Amino acid sequence: MFIPYVIEKSSRGERSYDIYSRLLKDRIIMLSGEIHDELAASIVAQLLFLEAEDPTKDIYLYINSPGGVITSGFSIYDTMNYIKPDVCTICIGQAASMGAFLLSCGAEGKRFALPNSRIMIHQPLGGARGQATDIEIQAKEILRLKTILNDILAKNTKQKVAKIAKDTERDFFMSTQEAKEYGLIDKVLEKSFK
């Protein structure tokens, strides 16, 4: 992946930054692509860094993700709740599966999407191999995770758990306006809110 660099001029000279480092100075974190352990570790580190820099200022988490590993997503979710600053979530492009879950986990009143974003929720995916006993253990674990995800989505959207469970049985796609009505986001952004 090509990462652009920007040059900042000051009275002390010029300094170049990769674009993500420059955005981090403005408290912006980009969650882009499939969510896995390596990406989650980077997001968690940035959240913790920004909290240490200033625990009173909001953090802006831009999401463009098809989803990914549940435990990786949970590490981001738990950190969002652990730190003091509010985390504003903004969907750009798509927020599907774990991406949509994290979008819904932004601070209340601070969950946004750009107009042409695509949002999708569904039940967790899993693949089990091995002996019958191992498959049974994996099935129980994925059902446990499904319950946790549904409970958190119900809390975030103010929907009943039964509705979340029904809607996530299959891929459930929403426009940004539908996601707002559903309670996954608070507002569709036409212009920057900063």
UniProtKB/Swiss-Prot annotation:
The EC number(s) this enzyme carries: 3.4.21.92
Active site: S97, H122
Keywords, sorted A to Z: Cytoplasm, Hydrolase, Protease, Serine protease
Catalytic activities: Hydrolysis of proteins to small peptides in the presence of ATP and magnesium. alpha-casein is the usual test substrate. In the absence of ATP, only oligopeptides shorter than five residues are hydrolyzed (such as succinyl-Leu-Tyr-|-NHMec, and Leu-Tyr-Leu-|-Tyr-Trp, in which cleavage of the -Tyr-|-Leu- and -Tyr-|-Trp bonds also occurs)
Entry's Gene Ontology cellular component terms: cytoplasm; endopeptidase Clp complex
UniProt subcellular location: Cytoplasm
Gene Ontology terms describing biological process: protein quality control for misfolded or incompletely synthesized proteins
A single GO molecular function term of this UniProt record: ATPase binding
InterPro entries named among the record's database cross-references: ClpP (IPR001907), ClpP/crotonase-like_dom_sf (IPR029045), ClpP/TepA (IPR023562), ClpP_His_AS (IPR033135), ClpP_Ser_AS (IPR018215)
Statement: the UniProt record of this protein carries the keyword Protease: yes
Family affiliation: Belongs to the peptidase S14 family.
Listed PANTHER family: ATP-DEPENDENT CLP PROTEASE PROTEOLYTIC SUBUNIT (PTHR10381:SF70)
Function noted in UniProt: Cleaves peptides in various proteins in a process that requires ATP hydrolysis. Has a chymotrypsin-like activity. Plays a major role in the degradation of misfolded proteins.
Subunit composition and interactions: Fourteen ClpP subunits assemble into 2 heptameric rings which stack back to back to give a disk-like structure with a central cavity, resembling the structure of eukaryotic proteasomes.
Name under which the protein is recorded: ATP-dependent Clp protease proteolytic subunit
Gene: clpP
